[in-house]
Amino acid sequence: MLSIMRRAGQTLAVAESCTGGLIAQRITSVPGCSEYFKLGVVPYSKDAKKAVLKISPQVLRKFGAVSEQVAIAMAQRVRRIVDADWGIAVTGIAGPSGATKAKPVGLVYLAVAGPDGVICRRHFFKGTRHNIRKKAAEAALDLLIRDLR
C-alpha cells in the first residue's frame, strides 16, 4: 500500500470499531507509513463515535452503531478531522455476543471516503472473533486499494 499511496501522493485516516486498531497496526508495521498515514482512532462505543467523530446521535439511534449510515459517516468524519485524502471506517459485530437476528455475529460494514465520494460494503464474515476482525481489516484495506487503482 505504501507504494500506491506514495505514487498517488495521497494521505489516509482510519476509524475502526470492531477491528480495534488492526488496520492501523497493519499500516504502521511498514516503515515509511508516516508519509501517508495521518490518523488511526478506535471509537468503539456509541459515546466515542459521538465524541470523537461527531456522529449524529439521531443517526446512531435510528440506524444503530452497526449500519451502513454510521460506517459512511465515520469514514467521512475521520477523513475531515485531519484533512486526509482518504478515510476508512469499519463497524461491525465480531461476537461472540452483541448480535441480534437482524444483525448477526460477523456482520461488518466497511466504508471508504475519498476525493470522488464514498463506497460502503456489507460483509458477513464467519469464524471466531479473532478471524472476523482479521477478515474485516483485510477487506477494508482491499477496498481502499481497489479504489486507489
Write out the residue ranges for each language-model feature.
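Short alpha-helical segments enriched in small residues
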Residues: 1-149
